[in-house]
Amino acid sequence: MKGLCVAACTLVLAAATPLTPRENTCTQGSKTPYGALTHSACPCWNWYEIQTGDGDCGKVASKFGVSREDVIRVEPGRVTPPNPLPTPPCNAADAPYPVGKGTVCGCKKWYRIRRGDDCGPVASEFGISADQLIEWNPWLSADVDGTHYPCMNIWPTDNLCVDVSSF
């Protein structure tokens, strides 16, 4: 979900051996791409960079001969059914790319996420609440195994709507 379908994000696919996510239990190797989630299956031996046109996780999974469910199991934070990949926003021909699926229509101001950003500080910078930021950019949140994680999917190079004042 980290802005899936853009070159800056990555998706983990475990090689042959089924793995389950284990947060903070090991350190990924030196070839771990920037943007890998801390709760990705660990250790991971194969990394895949999402390409424009990859579609959803099922299409990517089929490239590696695994099921969509396998991808979800090793990379739970990347996937929220039914289609986790971002699409261009409605009514915003001038919107930057990438913009996550479900971004509010008619956004008046955009912010490009930088490394180290988090929802609270970004929202404060633009005089809005973190709840407003997430409401306008719902793809920031994820539900994993019944637990809701607000602002889990804030990834560098993705774009956030930070103002709908004239909307």
From Swiss-Prot:
Protein keywords: Chitin-binding, Signal, Virulence
Signal peptide: 1-16
Taxonomy, superkingdom: Eukaryota
InterPro entries: LysM1-like (IPR052210), LysM_dom (IPR018392), LysM_dom_sf (IPR036779)
GO molecular function: chitin binding
Keyword Thylakoid found: no
CDD domains listed in its UniProt record: LysM (cd00118)
Additional observations: In plants, chitin acts as a microbe-associated molecular pattern (MAMP) that is recognized by lysin motif (LysM)-containing plant cell surface-localized pattern recognition receptors (PRRs) that activate a plethora of downstream immune responses.
Family classification: Belongs to the secreted LysM effector family.
Identification of the protein by name: Secreted LysM effector Blys6
